[in-house]
Amino acid sequence: MCYVYLLRSPKTKQIYTGFSEDLKRRVKEHQQLQRHKGWRLIYYEAYLSREDAVKREQMLKHYGSAKQGLLKRLEGSLKECDMLEDLE
């Protein structure tokens, strides 16, 4: 399985888009990096084909409309993240 994922910074609200064949391991690696401390997995897509996953990651990274469309679909979830972060 291959994954395309979004991480979100609770401090800056910045979104990071990535690709991995081992999602759990990759998220842990991100969180161990100083600049990604506290970042949370907010979304992922699973693909059987590595080629399809890489294409999707590139689409999200290089075509703003694709990423904006996805973020629009996640609007309610992002608001929930904000509320949870405010409680911490």
What are these regions (language model features)?
Residues 1-48, 52-61, 65, 71-88:
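GIY-YIG nuclease catalytic motif and its immediate N-terminal context
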